[in-house]
Each structure stands twice: as structure tokens, then as C-alpha cells.
Amino acid sequence: MFKILLVCSLAALVAANANVEVKELVNDVQPDGFVSKLVLDDGSASSATGDIHGNIDGVFEWISPEGVHVRVSYKADENGYQPQSDLLPTPPPIPAAILKAIAYIEANPSKN
């Protein structure tokens, strides 16, 4: 499923601007993993490496219409898809009272 998403993402990058030229293209598939890289002359790029266990590490980046360089790195493994970027939303910090309550509960487990 992830490979389909990666291929569709690459196709969308290429289809976004018909006048974009490929600067670098690498697709090296081996029995123990793969390396894939695509660099376009408009600043868009994608790269990924995968191993025999299905773990994938990658990065994709582009220049937004506002001129902002967007970069997303990710890991896909037994814990699922884990993207990281300064532009991705993050949850608010856990309030101190909640952390204190969790610590109390862990220190005083139920006797049932």
C-alpha cells in the first residue's frame, strides 16, 4: 500500500507542472531493499530507502505556491507511518496536573 502512495505522490509531483525536467532519477531495487530518488528542477524531490523487513525511511520536499520550502521526512515500519516536519500540526503539551495524576496512579495501582 505504501509503495502505491509513494508512486502516486511522485506522479502528482510530475503532473503538477508539465514543463518540469527531471534532474536525477534513481530506482535501485535489490533483494534486500531498495533506494529511490527523484529530483526535479523546480525544487521538488523525493527519496526513500527500504530494507528487507519492509521498513522505509524517506523524504519529500517541494516549494509551496507562497515560496516556502516544505520538507517532510518519514519512517514507515511496524509502528506505522511516522511523518516529521516543522509544518505538521503537533498536539498541545500535557498539563502539569494531568502528568501529576498519571504519576500518582502509576505509583498507587488499584488493589483489585
UniProtKB/Swiss-Prot annotation:
Originating organism: Drosophila melanogaster
Protein name: Larval cuticle protein 3
Record domain Chitin-binding type R&R: where: 31-92
Keyword Signal attributed: yes
Role description: Component of the larval cuticle.
Keyword terms, alphabetized: Cuticle, Signal
Entry keyword Signal: yes
Single biological process term from Gene Ontology: chitin-based cuticle development
GO cellular component terms, A-Z: chitin-based extracellular matrix
The encoding gene: Lcp3
Pfam families for this protein: Chitin_bind_4
UniProt superkingdom: Eukaryota
Single GO MF annotation: structural constituent of chitin-based larval cuticle
Signal peptide: 1-16
PROSITE patterns per the UniProt record, alphabetical: CHIT_BIND_RR_1 (PS00233), CHIT_BIND_RR_2 (PS51155)
